[in-house]
Amino acid sequence: MREFVYYSRTAPTAGNSIGKDLQEAGRIDIAVHTVIGVFFLSHKIRSDAKLHLLFAGPPDPVKHLEIQPVTEGKTGIDKIYLSKKDVSGILKRMLYKYREGERREVFPGFHIEKKNFLEVVRDLSEKGRNLYVLDPDGEDIRTADIKENPVFILGDHKGLPDKEFKRLKQLCTPITIGKRTYFASQTVSVVNNELDRREDEGRLPRE
């Protein structure tokens, strides 16, 4: 299983903060494109990926939205397919369904809770995941030793907070996808492509 952790300093933490203009809604448009980059192939949704969204914008930070879409069965009351056309609507509904003090499953595979960024990262570390943080000064992903069950951590257009980033370097291996700066959605697509290649070549176990 490959996992991604996306941290946004500005993404809203209440459903009523998300309107039609996604850029004005704390740049949640970046999170939407990141969801698409993590899960969508042509005519297919990945079943080997999980995404952790950490929203630290107003009014009630930090919200942890965990997404691992159901890819089998019928859509309806008890199951939901992830649709590119309505990612923002799904995130909005998840935020509306949050209840204080609960980790709540909004749809099968879609959970929300209040949890800070480093707590999520530490939990993944304690589960034995191999952690990698996107860092311009890190090792090139093409030559890096990517181990089984990797987790890749990245920030929004403002990047990861300096204090948290310093702590992350103690838990994670810094890697880069190149010298140029890419959108978060492009970054996860590049990482996915590298993992796909390694799996296809037998250099990384396939989920």
What are these regions (language model features)?
Residues 56-58, 62, 67-69, 136-145, ...:
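Extended interaction regions within the primary functional domain
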Residues 111-149, 159-167:
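Active-site cofactor/cluster-binding pocket
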Residues 135, 153-156, 177-178:
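Thr-Gly-centered strand-to-loop micro-motif
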